Amino acid sequence: EYPYEGQILVDGTDLQAMDEADRTKRIGYLGHDPELFFDSVENNILLGDKKEADDYLKAVCMEQEVAEMADGKKTVVGNGGVRLSGGQAKRLALARTLCHKKPVLILDDPFSALDKNTEKQIFANLKQQTKDNIVFLISHRLYLFPQMNQVIWMEDGKAVAGTHEEILEKIPEYRSLYETQSDERENAKVETENRKTVSEHTEE
């Protein structure tokens, strides 16, 4: 039932000793393909709680997009409602997760389909909103990893944990992936600056 050896302790309690209700109370999970309810944007976030949805829409950089919808926060989404992009659906689901955040959060690639600036802002907001939580972030965006307290490298059923710098030293594959992504980001930045320069010269 549990595909690992040893113990995983949450607040001193073995994960295997918890019943389903206890695990649900302590651990929140946002999957790679989250489901939205056929309901308003607001209700998808609050799930009946008496809170302000605006705070969570702002945290996921979605307040302006929702304000521009025909019915704003009352706009019905989900299967049969207004169709959202993949990135919008993920951000709305992340807003719901933050509204009902548990002591431990597992987030599976919540920043996919986002532009870099939006991604950076949401990540900064996420850090602010979860200062008192343990967050496991599963992501392909390795440029974020230097900001993590710990990085966990998992391969062949084994895990190695440490700071970003420690994992760079211990795991050659991690270093290779990180440096490859760094080179790709730098090349993309140069291309963008070159296009901007060409555009400015053309306008002159």
Spans of model-derived segments:
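Conserved "ABC signature" C-loop
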Residues: 34-76, 101, 117-118, 173-176
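Conserved ABC transporter NBD signature motif
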Residues: 6-13, 23
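ABC nucleotide-binding domain signature
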Residues: 21, 25-32, 134-136
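Conserved D-loop/post-Walker B switch-helix segment of ABC ATPase nucleotide-binding domains
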Residues: 115-125
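ABC-fold ATPase nucleotide-binding domain signature/coupling loops
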Residues: 3-4, 9, 63-92, 101, ...
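C-terminal portion of ABC ATPase nucleotide-binding domains
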Residues: 72, 124, 128-131, 137, ...
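A residue-level structural signal marking coil residues immediately N-terminal to beta-strands
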Residues: 102-103, 133
